[in-house]
């Protein structure tokens, strides 16, 4: 190694560790920047609201001949009632069956508006176990939705590309029927760009948000801007709880409204989740680009190449020079991973830092079902490039994650 030859290299830094540290630093800077912006925008409003409240409290105390301590004690009781779901206006019961169903929906989706919380010890204990299974199941559902959505989008875009090539005369009926002719065929190596997929998800999320906002403006009496704000907070599962839909005691066409409210929130969460994961691929690509620049431009010649290359779910080492991100259209996650299964033995401890959770889960499932399916074409390099969660779902659907490139 050149670094050791000149005596100035501190040693190799694993690329995954470098990526993790760089991303952690960027997120910290992002948090600091966000805190500065929100403090500049909201602090003055908070101080003004606090001053107005103190003035109203003093005026009310003088007008009704009440001590400030007595009045504050009464207001604390009101705060406790508010936390228990009691409101001055008429609202729907929080813990009837429909209210409880709305609550468990916010639990398993991780939205957690906070307008309803369990008050009993039994309810809090049950929530811990219920949320453990429910949240994990919902995340699995979101990943499966993401997998199928991307497959559908890619197939539709591939079909459109076929029609475009057919109009140009680049694809004939003969080579459409003979995909085995190899990479020379105009369709074989084509994949839709991830930027188009992100645009489609963006448009779908905006369309759902606009439609839902129109509904909430009509039914809840919110301004359209507040409705759009609620949609983003709910669909992204941030769930502040300052605005919550379907909380009034009565609505016009109440059953229909509650159904559409549930359906729109479900579809919005699925689309925003998918959009976030596609954006995260681009963020990771940007982090990889920064790492390459740091490795090639910021180190002296004797220390260049300190980052130990390692294949990963977004940018494997052997395709590091590719910059066009695109999505595969062939196959799904199950079929993609059939050729990358380990033999029946358990994984040695020295390799546990390389094995993705997705592959480990598949191995355990195979062993529980009597052993894995053998495939002579499997290779050890591909076993560790599956990724985790949504990254595993999109493995081999992006050019940067293709195991054969």
From Swiss-Prot:
CC annotations in GO: monoatomic ion channel complex; plasma membrane
Residues that coordinate or bind K(+) 4: 110, 237
Intramembrane region positions: 95-115, 224-244
The organism's place on the tree of life at top rank: Eukaryota
Keyword Amino-acid biosynthesis among UniProt keywords: no
Amino acids binding K(+) 1: 110-111, 237-238
Biological process according to GO: regulation of excitatory synapse pruning; regulation of NLRP3 inflammasome complex assembly; regulation of resting membrane potential
Residues engaged in binding K(+) 3: 112, 239-240
Subunit structure: Homodimer. Heterodimer with KCNK12.
Family listed: Belongs to the two pore domain potassium channel (TC 1.A.1.8) family.
Record remark on domains: Each subunit contributes two pore-forming domains 1 and 2 which assemble to form a single pore with M2 and M4 transmembrane helices lining the central cavity and M1 and M3 facing the lipid bilayer. The transmembrane helices are bridged by the selectivity filters 1 and 2 that coordinate the permeant ions. Up to four ions can simultaneously occupy the selectivity filter and at least two elementary charges must translocate across the filter to convert it into the open conformation.
Name used for this protein in its record: Potassium channel subfamily K member 13
């Amino acid at each position: 190694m050149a670094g050791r030859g000149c005596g100035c290299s501190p040693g190799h830094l694993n690329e995954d560790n470098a990526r993790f540290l760089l991303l952690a630093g960027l997120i910290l800077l992002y948090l600091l920047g966000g805190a500065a912006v929100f403090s500049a925008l909201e602090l003055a409003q908070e101080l003004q609201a606090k001053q107005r409240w103190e003035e109203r409290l003093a005026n009310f105390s003088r007008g009704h001949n009440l001590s400030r301590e007595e009045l504050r004690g009464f207001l604390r009781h009101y705060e406790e009632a508010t936390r228990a779901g009691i409101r001055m206006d008429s609202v729907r019961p929080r813990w009837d069956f429909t209210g409880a169903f709305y609550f468990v929906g916010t639990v398993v989706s991780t939205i957690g508006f906070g307008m309803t919380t369990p008050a009993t010890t039994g309810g809090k204990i049950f929530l811990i176990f219920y949320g453990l299974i429910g949240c994990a199941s919902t995340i699995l559902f979101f990943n499966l939705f993401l997998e199928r959505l991307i497959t559908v989008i890619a197939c539709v875009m591939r079909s459109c590309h076929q029609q475009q090539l057919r109009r140009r005369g680049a694809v004939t009926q003969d080579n459409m029927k003979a995909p085995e002719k190899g990479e020379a065929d105009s369709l074989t190596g084509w994949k839709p760009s991830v930027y188009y997929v992100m645009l489609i998800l963006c448009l779908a999320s905006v369309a759902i948000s606009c439609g839902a906002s129109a509904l909430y403006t009509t039914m809840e009496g919110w301004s359209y801007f507040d409705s759009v704000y609620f949609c983003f907070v709910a669909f992204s599962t941030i769930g502040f709880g300052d605005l919550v839909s379907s909380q009034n005691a009565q609505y016009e066409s109440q059953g229909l409204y509650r159904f559409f409210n549930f359906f729109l929130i479900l579809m919005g969460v699925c689309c925003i989740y998918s959009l976030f994961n596609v954006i995260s691929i681009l963020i990771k690509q940007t982090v990889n680009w920064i790492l390459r620049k740091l490795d090639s431009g910021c180190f002296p010649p004797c220390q260049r190449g300190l980052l130990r290359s390692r294949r990963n779910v977004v940018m494997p080492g052997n395709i590091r020079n590719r910059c066009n991100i695109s999505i595969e259209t062939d196959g799904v996650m199950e079929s993609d991973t059939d050729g990358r299964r380990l033999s029946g033995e358990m994984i040695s401890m020295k390799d546990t830092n390389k094995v993705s959770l997705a592959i480990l889960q598949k191995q355990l499932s195979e062993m529980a079902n009597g052993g894995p399916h053998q495939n002579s074409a499997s290779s050890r390099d591909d076993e560790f490039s599956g990724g985790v969660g949504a990254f595993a779902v999109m493995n081999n659907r992006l050019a940067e994650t293709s195991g054969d490139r």
